[in-house]
Regions:
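Residues embedded in well-ordered beta-strands within globular domains across many folds
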Residues: 26-28, 69, 146-149, 177
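A contiguous active-site-proximal alpha/beta segment in oxidoreductase catalytic domains
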Residues: 90-92, 97-175
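N-terminal glycine-/serine-/threonine-rich beta1-alpha1-beta2 phosphate-ribose binding loop
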Residues: 1-93, 99-117
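Short coil/turn segments at secondary-structure boundaries
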Residues: 52, 148-151, 187-192
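Short, small-residue-rich loop/turn micro-motifs
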Residues: 6, 31, 152, 180, ...
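Redox-cofactor-proximal catalytic regions of oxidoreductases
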Residues: 19, 125-126, 183-185
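Glycine-rich, aromatic-lined ligand/substrate-binding cores of catalytic
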Residues: 169-193
């Protein structure tokens, strides 16, 4: 199961759906507007449509799932990861794996206690092009390398300063806030763009 249907989660949905060793059975997202696109992306790659839910806890409780992918906003990485490991599921979680050191320590404790695998994703370090570049540097072909710098530019433009607004229909904003301080809804805090 995948928790999240936009941003990094959408990209992860694509990757796992193309993997012959994985099947995305259910996608959870508390914004119902994001689910149709995620389902379609998975269907095109995997040939079957995943179920959807607005509450990630349904994935935690589903005994047919053996692993959970956590592609939520940063402040929601640790809690579902810990819950999944307690429920006997392995976890792939996006970076950062936790919002603070205490959450990180609790994740490690859950992983050890329940003997689960918990991997934090770091897609740029894991890509073929980065691995190829690193292998080339290690050959010594460039001489002794003391520092390497890289950057990535995005041409999406400025996000602006939208005013706070009403929560979109169907969105469980209280759940989205979770343990974070409750603030008025703002599209830049919620989805960015």
């Amino acid at each position: 199961g995948v928790i999240g249907a936009g941003g990094r989660a959408l990209s992860l949905n694509r990757s796992f759906a193309e993997n012959a060793n994985a099947e995305i059975v259910t996608i959870a997202d508390l914004d119902p507007r994001r689910l149709p696109r995620a389902v379609e992306e998975v269907y095109r790659r995997q040939g079957s449509k995943p179920k959807t839910t607005g509450d990630f806890r349904h994935l935690i409780d589903d005994n047919s799932l053996d692993a959970i992918v956590v592609g939520t906003p940063d402040h929601w990485h640790a809690i579902p990861s810990i819950m999944a490991m307690i429920a006997g599921k392995d976890v792939y979680v996006e970076k950062p794996d936790s919002h603070n050191i205490v959450e990180g320590m609790r994740m490690v404790a859950a992983m050890k206690k329940h003997k689960r695998i918990c991997q934090m994703g770091s897609q740029h370090r894991s890509t073929t092009r980065m691995q190829t570049a690193l292998a080339y540097i290690k050959t010594g072909a460039l001489g002794r390398c003391l520092v390497a710098k890289a950057w990535e530019s995005s041409r999406q433009g400025a996000i602006g300063f939208p005013k706070d607004s009403q929560v979109p229909a169907g969105v469980n904003y209280d759940m989205w806030c979770g343990a974070a301080p409750k603030r008025p809804f703002n599209v830049n805090r919620f989805h960015g763009r």
